[in-house]
């Protein structure tokens, strides 16, 4: 059934891009990379926000071009923001400005023009939504960039990009679909067996590094950035078991699927998957402490705090799901933070707590 569901979530079938369009995209991306290498960040940002949006608007509204012909310029727009978001420091005001740009672009739509025969209007509807209201292709492009380049880029660039994506997700752009990138990231760092850190090498750019070569220290900063910035969104999606994304993204990692929590959980976000992430953070914290990895230990502790504080403030369904679970889960030492949130007394026998829940 997954392939039928994926066909509904993916873009409609269409012809392959023309050779001319592919050549333009290749040259355009190379030009963008050269501008980034020169440090022309502000000029590039202006080109994205003003020039690219103007080209799309002018071609559709003034020239009367079909919406398919402007898609290459939309992809160009998102590629510029991808490059800027990973090169500009996530702690800078300029990085916040990139997020504001995306929200302002969303506010430009819907793009329309008078229909032929002066009867109504034509709306710029792409296979991935309406320009500019739905920010078509933004989520798909950013997901592809993360999958293709997330392993090879430096730790600084990975953190900058993850922070940008989490900020967009916290604003609920594209109807929460940006959060599918968090699923990919969390599956890699929390649901797959990774070494904590096997060497002393820095997390610099490595074009030969694949996803299978990554370790916890590569990915944990990006994951905790998501938990810090978009914690409420991730908790909300977990409460409602959100899975509005293709199955190859929503499916759990091997370690999660083999766990008791994984056997309870559907694909996508769920209360049980949220608990598993908390459990893994607690395990990582302990492993880091034992290995003397102070930075990783503190990051894991921060992640636990962000997750715990969020579901506590929401009186979340996640806490109620934990309360209703069996005693084996309640006694898991790596879920002690959930015991506290659920109001369990560590000195009280489990049988007494079970009676109290049933009464």
From Swiss-Prot:
Region (Disordered): 1-32
Knockout or disruption consequences: Does not affect the production of oxopyrrolidines A and B.
InterPro entries in the record: OpdG, Oxopyrrolidines_Biosynth-assoc
Amino acid composition bias (Low complexity), ranges on this chain: 7-18
UniProt cross-references to Pfam families, sorted A to Z: DUF3632
Role played: Part of the gene cluster that mediates the biosynthesis of oxopyrrolidines, polyketide-amino acid hybrid compounds with feature structures of tetramic acid. Does not seem to play a role in oxopyrrolidines A and B biosynthesis.
Protein name stated in the entry: Oxopyrrolidines biosynthesis cluster protein G
Organism: Penicillium oxalicum (strain 114-2 / CGMCC 5302)
């Amino acid at each position: 059934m997954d392939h039928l569901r994926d066909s509904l979530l993916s873009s409609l079938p269409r012809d392959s891009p023309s050779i001319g369009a592919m050549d333009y995209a290749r040259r355009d991306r190379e030009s963008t990379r050269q501008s980034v290498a020169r440090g022309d960040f502000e000029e590039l940002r202006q080109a994205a926000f003003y020039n690219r949006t103007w080209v799309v608007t002018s071609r559709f509204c003034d020239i009367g071009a079909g919406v398919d012909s402007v898609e290459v310029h939309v992809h160009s727009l998102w590629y510029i923001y991808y490059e800027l978001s990973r090169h500009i420091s996530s702690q800078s005001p300029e990085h916040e400005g990139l997020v504001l740009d995306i929200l302002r672009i969303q506010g430009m739509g819907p793009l329309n023009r008078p229909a032929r025969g002066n009867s109504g209007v034509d709306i710029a509807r792409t296979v991935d939504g309406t320009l500019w209201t739905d920010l078509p292709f933004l989520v798909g492009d950013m997901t592809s960039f993360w999958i293709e380049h997330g392993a090879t880029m430096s730790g600084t660039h990975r953190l900058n990009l993850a922070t940008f994506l989490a900020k967009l997700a916290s604003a609920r752009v594209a109807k929460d679909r940006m959060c599918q990138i968090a699923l990919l990231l969390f599956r890699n760092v929390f649901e797959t067996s990774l070494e904590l850190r096997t060497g002393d090498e820095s997390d610099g750019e490595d074009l030969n590094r694949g996803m299978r070569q990554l370790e916890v220290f590569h990915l944990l900063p990006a994951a905790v950035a998501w938990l810090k910035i978009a914690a409420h969104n991730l908790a909300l999606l977990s409460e409602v078991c959100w899975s509005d994304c293709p199955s190859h993204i929503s499916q759990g990692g091997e370690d999660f699927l083999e766990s008791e929590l994984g056997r309870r959980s559907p694909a996508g976000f769920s209360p049980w998957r949220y608990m598993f992430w908390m459990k893994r953070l607690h395990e990582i914290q302990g492993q880091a402490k034992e290995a003397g990895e102070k930075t990783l230990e503190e990051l894991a502790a921060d992640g636990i705090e962000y997750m715990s504080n969020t579901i506590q403030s929401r009186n979340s369904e996640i806490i109620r799901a934990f309360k209703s679970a069996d005693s084996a889960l309640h006694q898991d030492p790596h879920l002690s933070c959930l015991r506290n949130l659920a109001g369990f007394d560590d000195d009280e026998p489990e049988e007494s707590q079970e009676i109290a829940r049933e009464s």
